[in-house]
Structures are given as C-alpha cells and as structure tokens.
Regions:
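Divalent metal-coordination and catalytic microenvironments
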Residues: 11, 16, 41, 52, ...
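Active-site mouth loops of central-metabolism enzymes
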Residues: 54-67, 118-124, 152-156
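Active-site environment of divalent metal-dependent phosphoester hydrolases
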Residues: 56, 90-95, 122-124, 188-194
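Metal-associated gating/positioning segment near the N- to mid-region
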Residues: 36-102
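Distinct, well-ordered alpha-helical segments
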Residues: 125-133, 159-164, 190-203
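Active-site core of metal-dependent hydrolases
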Residues: 153, 167-207
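Histidine-rich, glycine-flanked metal-binding segment
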Residues: 1-45
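Hydrophobic faces of well-ordered beta-strands that scaffold small-molecule active sites
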Residues: 47-51, 84-86, 114-118, 141-149, ...
C-alpha cells in the first residue's frame, strides 16, 4: 500500500530510505551486507501519521499526581507511527511551550518526523516568539496552532479571539510556506460547533 493497494512487490531499502519498489528486484548481493526479509502474507504500509500526540504528557486535571508521563519514542514506533504532531493538553503552564519544542526536536533526532502546534487551551496563546504568526514563520517545527472551545477547561475564548488565532496561523503559514492550520479541541459544552460555523460563514479564513 502506498497508499493505494500495489499488489505483491519486492522492496529495496538502503539505510532508512526506500530505494525501489518493483514486481521483482533481482541481483547478486552476496558481497554486500544485505538482509533479506521474507514477508509473504504480510502487509507493508507507509509509516502512520498521528496528528495529536501529547509527547510531554497531559492530564493533571485532578492535581499533580494525575499528570501523565512524557512519551518515549518506543511507545510511538511500536504501533507503526513514524510521523507525529506534538501539542499541549489542558495544562500549558506547568508544561510550557519550550519543553514541547525541545521534546519535538528530541524525537526527530531519535529518528521519526516530528512537528508541533503552538498554543494550548490557554488564551492568549503561549508561544515561542511572542506571537502565533511569528512562531509559524520562524520556527520550522511549528505547523499550526491549538486552542479549545465549548469546554469547561478552556479559557472561554470569544469568537474574535479564535478568529485572530486562526488568522495568525493561516497568514503565518502563508509567509512560512506551511499549511498553517488551527487545531481546535471541542468539548461537550452546549455551544458545540456554533462558534466555528459562525467563523466559517462570516470570515474569509479558509476552513
């Protein structure tokens, strides 16, 4: 699968890169340090992408003892995940944005593709450079922003605040050559998606 079904194939891998995929890869590799894996009956897929990973832990809503621990790379790759987007949970204070950035960099150094979202449940957003737009433009690993609505744990942002956050993520993405999206945690509050529907209807920000 890549991602559509390709049928039965041979795959040649050099180091950490796929060099060739073909019906049959033949050759004399006896003088090389080559390992052959017989994968008959198995399924080969690209590494999975997880767009919502609390790499420095989350929780803490019932006190310090309820905080979840930092994630290790072994817990990520054992499930076939090779690309992650790191983000804050409810707590963006005791777990700061600098720690999130450092962990994102560490995971990439350990061998996976790692990106992150700036901001958290808190508004105004905690950022690395002083603004969401500047994070988007100047911090290579920042690809979007996060906030929360319709949730008792959110900062109860107004529609104008969410509009400004989304606009900064979008325009910063344009300038920085990124998608520039806004990741919004949605709680079980009575307002549900009404704020987002209003923003899509009333502003020029692409949904």
């Amino acid at each position: 699968y890549s991602p559509a079904p390709m049928g039965r194939k041979d795959v040649l891998i050099e180091g950490d890169k796929v060099i060739k995929i073909a019906d049959r890869i033949a050759g004399d590799y006896s003088e090389l340090n080559v390992k052959t894996v017989e994968a008959e009956g198995k399924t080969l897929v690209p590494g999975f992408v997880d767009q919502h990973v609390h790499v420095i832990g989350a929780g803490g809503e019932a006190g310090f003892a309820t905080r979840t621990p930092e994630m290790q790379i072994s817990n990520i790759v054992k499930h076939g995940i090779t690309t992650i987007v790191a983000l804050h949970g409810t707590d963006g204070t005791a777990r700061n944005i600098e720690a999130l950035y450092a962990k994102t960099c560490a995971l990439e150094e350990e061998g996976i593709t790692a990106r992150m979202l700036t901001g958290s449940f808190e508004m105004p957003s905690a950022t690395l450079t002083g603004s969401v737009r500047r994070d988007m433009i100047f911090i290579d690993k920042v690809i979007g922003a996060k906030t929360a609505i319709s949730d008792r744990r959110s900062s109860q942002p107004t529609k104008a605040m969410v509009e400004q956050l989304a606009a900064q993520a979008y325009t910063g993405g344009l300038a920085g050559g990124k998608r520039g999206y806004t990741h919004i945690h949605l709680g079980v509050g009575a307002r549900k998606l009404s704020m987002l529907k209003d923003i899509i209807r009333e502003t020029e920000i692409p949904p």
